[in-house]
């Protein structure tokens, strides 16, 4: 079926390309006309286009003229003219497609065309890049075109506060990374005032390196989490225990490792050893569940997470490495205890665990946009997935000049040692004649191994990996110069062209930056100096370019095949840009991960049969086909996992949409009085039905019902009064009558409550403001608890398959039930708090507004004379509510909030446990975790920013999620403490002197410590 769909998708390519070519011809036909316009006239076209759009013309109608204007502006600002194929690519993006354009074809310049056109609608365009460097670079570089045409350009960076972010999103075109856009969406839906909301909608997005972002990063979600209590000693203890346990196969040893699935299974022997070490009878008792999580994480840290491949240790800190790009992911941590397990393994300080507060997958975030488009050099291999999940077509755009790169067959050696020896020899020969060489490795460890071998041969080279990524743009820009040898961990997403002889544009920008000139800070001086500096560097590299062409162009040498064909193609694609010559080859060994895990035995049998020496390579198309088959298997497996993730996340996505829409309504100051009235009706109805659903009327426990109702509101009716109204006999009561009378009584009490609270000096009823505060606080807390419960449900749902039940159907059914329960809980708690919180109108001293630091959630709430201010939602005029003291209710996870204090009189909540429930969450440093490229196409699991437990595919050995771990800790009391007297036999008396057996005293994790 996928093959048939691929054929159908390709069948329409010719028709689409003919349409795009016709558009390019339209743009060409008016090019001379636009060239005659003055700068002012060209800039004035933007206002004209906007007016025509407002008068009813569509963006499609404006496309040829808008594209012609951008092409002319690019010539005048950058000295670059959009080729016809770039016009075609821009049109493909405007129509909501993915444009596949080979490396060096100018994708960045292409994006300016649809970005400008869609910005004319006035609703904002988001240009999404894979890293902050590219976002800043493109906002400055391509932003020159847009600013010349009168548009505002913004850029989002992690260091920005809310005000700066809001300004950036208000611009016509906003550049940023996928993670920043996604986190801003989540933060906006955690805001306590409209002023904190920074995004203004999701109209149109252009995603650069779209395959990396929408495919590779799609399996793991963006997560904002907050710290929870944990016992660090367990991580250290289990790290030591993991070192003692022995790996085995076929039931031997203490545990087994499946490297393909990246799972670990504990054997019976291993379980017995762990139980003996811990001094417990049954490791899998419910009270010991957290211990199982610690054990699994410790073993995964030992076997599956390798230093200098998956992470590096710098200055006593474990830093994650992006497998595909080789970059260090600063500030990112594995979730669910995995990062702490690695820290314990490495013997560095262990940092706190986190609990999920808000989450969304990139799949669902980008589906929020009304129109989505993307660019990449490698999309056709995933065309089926783009179509099925995102409804995006893939349009392969022709190259401006024919591709003449020579892709040599793979060569395979028996050992890694022999492979690297051959690699160094090949590099030495190419370097000796002056041909530039780009070497791709799959890990920091391998790049440094190769670097050491090159140093011993006396070959000068540059290393581009996670440890030196600050220099990466400069290194890549020079990788095409004569005699250059560049060793790169991976080339995916580098974003800088490798031009033969050197990159004149990069060198020109670098020189202007050294002079202190910037297109943003000093635009006039920058624009004046640019043409001369660019021309100087073009001349400087022209002669060297011709010389390198004669030497054969850039030689790309891959030292290992990746799980994904796209990553291999991205590495190869660095050579042969814009019709330049080039060559590529991959060197492999039977010890490489892909060969070892998939087709290694077959290839080894061939080599042994042919009696191949260790240092003689096997160069065969059959081997190449076997490797391609292995890669296809991995890609299909990962596609199925991503589809499965989407099915599960769709359940939470619908719930998220309901909650976030309601939250926005509250924040924007809608009158909640009618809604609160419905809440009262629903809660009273639920209380009565629960008390009357069984037995006859005379058997109903009305006393218990009245006791429950008194905890909800001040009941004015007595049981005798209600019975008297029914003729004096309880048998005459009906549930409907009780609901009617008690609802009337509750509304009477609420009206009295409103009158008693009175009004603020501006005339607004106090109860209206209180309603907003209460509903917002309760909704946030209940939603966080629901996320935590849904996470726990998803973690164990795969076990339902053993009972012949579809786990997805079960998850949908139970998730819906839990969501309805949460909504009922929001109503009940809101009503209870509205009746019970003690509010007083008191003078409040003027205090400054304190805003949350959006980047890290580390803002500080402002304090007035009456305590810490409750953030004031929009639409709420007048003074602020103030709880005293500002404390977080037990079990309530703090989230960042801005404090909006108004001078003059205000409302103050009397000191009580109820008031604490309405206290604004204390600003705290939050953890932002996000997927990286190895989330899908790489390891076959979502290892980058959140651990496997978040995906529903099930595994043999996985630790608890943040939510479940927190709940298990809460349920098990103090079990998670290091065992005292750990060497004591389990049946012996405990050394503490209690007289109890050790296993029932300090040998029990619940009593340990």
Swiss-Prot record:
It is an enzyme of class 7 (translocase). Residues 869-894, 949-1009 are annotated as: Disordered. Zn(2+) binds at residues 990, 992, 1001-1002. It is a peripheral membrane protein. It is found in: Cell membrane; Cytoplasm. GO terms for cellular component: cell envelope Sec protein transport complex; cytosol; plasma membrane. CDD domains: DEXDc_SecA, SF2_C_secA. Belongs to the SecA family. Part of the Sec protein translocase complex. Interacts with the SecYEG preprotein conducting channel. Has a central role in coupling the hydrolysis of ATP to the transfer of proteins into and across the cell membrane, serving as an ATP-driven molecular motor driving the stepwise translocation of polypeptide chains across the membrane. This is Protein translocase subunit SecA. The lineage of its organism: Bacteria, Bacillati, Actinomycetota, Actinomycetes, Acidothermales. The gene is secA.
């Amino acid at each position: 079926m996928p093959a048939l769909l691929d054929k159908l998708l390709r069948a329409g390519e010719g028709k689409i390309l003919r349409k795009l070519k016709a558009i390019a011809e339209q743009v060409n036909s008016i090019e001379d006309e636009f060239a005659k316009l003055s700068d002012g006239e060209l800039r004035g076209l933007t206002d004209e286009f906007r007016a025509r759009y407002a008068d009813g013309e569509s963006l499609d109608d404006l496309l040829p003229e808008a594209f012609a204007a951008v092409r002319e502006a690019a010539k005048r600002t950058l000295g670059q003219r959009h080729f016809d194929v770039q016009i075609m690519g821009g049109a493909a993006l405007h129509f909501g497609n993915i444009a596949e354009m080979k490396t060096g074809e100018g994708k960045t310049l292409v994006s300016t065309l649809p970005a400008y056109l869609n910005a004319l609608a006035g609703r904002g365009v988001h240009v999404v890049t894979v890293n902050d460097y590219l976002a800043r670079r493109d906002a400055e570089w391509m932003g020159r075109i847009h600013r010349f045409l009168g548009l505002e350009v913004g850029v989002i960076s992690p260091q920005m506060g809310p005000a700066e972010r809001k300004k950036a999103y208000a611009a016509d075109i906003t550049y940023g990374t996928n993670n920043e856009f996604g986190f801003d969406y989540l933060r906006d839906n955690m805001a306590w005032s409209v002023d904190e909301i920074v995004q203004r909608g999701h109209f149109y997005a252009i995603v650069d390196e779209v395959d990396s972002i929408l495919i590779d990063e799609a399996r793991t979600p963006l997560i904002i989490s907050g710290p929870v209590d944990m016992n660090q000693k367990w991580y250290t203890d289990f790290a030591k225990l993991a070192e003692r346990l022995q790996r085995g196969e076929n039931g031997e040893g203490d545990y087994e490792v499946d490297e393909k699935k990246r799972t670990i299974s504990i054997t019976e022997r291993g379980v017995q050893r762990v139980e003996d070490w811990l001094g417990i009878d049954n490791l899998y008792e419910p009270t010991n569940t957290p211990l199982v999580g610690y054990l699994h994480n410790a073993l995964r840290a030992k076997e599956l997470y390798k230093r200098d491949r998956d992470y590096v240790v710098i200055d006593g800190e474990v830093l994650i490495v992006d497998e595909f790009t080789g970059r260090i992911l600063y500030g990112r941590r594995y979730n669910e205890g995995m990062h702490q397990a690695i820290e314990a393994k490495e013997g560095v300080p262990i940092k706190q665990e986190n609990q999920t507060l808000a989450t969304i997958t990139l799949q669902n975030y980008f589906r929020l946009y009304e129109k989505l488009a993307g660019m990449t050099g490698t999309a056709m291999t995933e065309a089926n997935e783009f179509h099925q999940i995102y409804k995006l077509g893939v349009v392969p755009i022709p190259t401006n000049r024919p591709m003449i790169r020579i892709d040599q067959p793979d060569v395979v050696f028996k050992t890694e040692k022999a492979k690297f020896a051959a690699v160094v020899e090949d590099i030495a020969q190419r370097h000796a004649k002056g041909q530039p060489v780009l070497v791709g490795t799959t890990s920091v460890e391998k790049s440094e191994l190769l670097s050491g071998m090159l140093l011993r041969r006396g070959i000068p080279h540059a290393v581009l990996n996670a440890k030196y990524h600050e220099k990466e743009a400069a290194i890549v820009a020079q990788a095409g110069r004569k005699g250059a040898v560049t060793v790169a961990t991976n080339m995916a997403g580098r974003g800088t062209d490798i031009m033969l002889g050197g990159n004149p544009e990069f060198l020109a920008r670098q020189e202007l930056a050294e002079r202190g000139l910037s297109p943003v800070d000093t635009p006039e001086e920058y624009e004046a100096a640019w043409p001369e500096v660019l021309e100087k560097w073009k001349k400087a590299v022209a002669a060297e370019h011709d010389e390198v062409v004669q030497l054969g162009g850039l030689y790309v040498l891959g030292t290992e095949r990746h799980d994904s064909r796209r990553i291999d193609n991205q590495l190869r694609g660095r050579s042969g840009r814009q019709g330049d010559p080039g060559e590529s080859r991959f060197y492999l060994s039977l010890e490489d991960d892909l060969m070892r895990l998939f087709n290694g035995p077959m290839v080894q049998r061939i080599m042994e049969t042919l009696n191949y020496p260790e240092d003689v390579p096997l160069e065969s198309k059959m081997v190449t086909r076997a490797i391609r088959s292995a890669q296809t298997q991995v890609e299909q497996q990962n596609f199925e996992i991503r589809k499965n993730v989407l099915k599960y996340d769709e359940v939470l996505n619908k719930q998220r949409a309901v909650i976030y829409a309601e939250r926005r309504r509250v924040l924007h100051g809608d009158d909640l009085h009618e809604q609160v009235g419905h809440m009262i009706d629903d809660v009273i109805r639920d209380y009565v039905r629960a008390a009357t659903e069984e037995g006859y009327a005379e058997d109903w426990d009305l006393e218990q019902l009245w006791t429950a109702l008194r905890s909800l509101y001040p009941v004015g009716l007595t049981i005798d009064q209600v019975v008297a109204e029914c003729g004096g006999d309880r048998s005459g009561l009906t549930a409907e009558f009780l609901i009617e009378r008690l609802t009337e009584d509750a509304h009477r009490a609420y009206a009295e409550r409103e009158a008693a609270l009175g009004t603020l000096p501006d005339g607004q009823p106090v109860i209206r403001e209180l309603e907003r505060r209460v509903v917002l606080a309760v909704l946030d807390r209940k939603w966080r608890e629901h996320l935590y419960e849904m996470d726990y449900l998803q973690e164990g749902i795969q076990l339902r398959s053993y009972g012949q039940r579809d786990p997805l159907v079960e998850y949908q059914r139970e998730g819906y039930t839990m969501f309805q329960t949460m909504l009922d809980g929001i109503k009940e708690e809101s009503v209870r708090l509205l009746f019970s919180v003690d509010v007083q109108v008191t003078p409040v001293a003027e205090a400054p507004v304190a805003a949350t630091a959006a980047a890290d959630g580390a803002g500080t709430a402002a304090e007035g004379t009456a305590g810490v201010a409750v953030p004031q939602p929009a639409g709420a005029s007048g003074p602020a509510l103030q709880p005293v003291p500002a404390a977080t209710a037990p079990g309530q996870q703090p989230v960042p909030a801005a404090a909006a204090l108004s001078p003059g009189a205000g409302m103050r909540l009397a000191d009580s446990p109820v008031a604490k429930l309405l206290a604004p969450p204390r600003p705290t440093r939050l953890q932002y975790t996000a997927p990286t490229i190895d989330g899908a196409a790489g390891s076959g699991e979502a290892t980058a920013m959140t651990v496997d437990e978040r995906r529903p595919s099930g595994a043999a050995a996985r630790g608890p999620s943040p939510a479940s771990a927190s709940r298990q800790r809460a349920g098990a009391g103090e079990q998670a403490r290091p065992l005292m007297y750990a060497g004591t036999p389990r049946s012996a008396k405990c050394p503490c002197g209690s007289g109890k057996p050790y296993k029932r005293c300090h040998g029990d994790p619940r009593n340990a410590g």
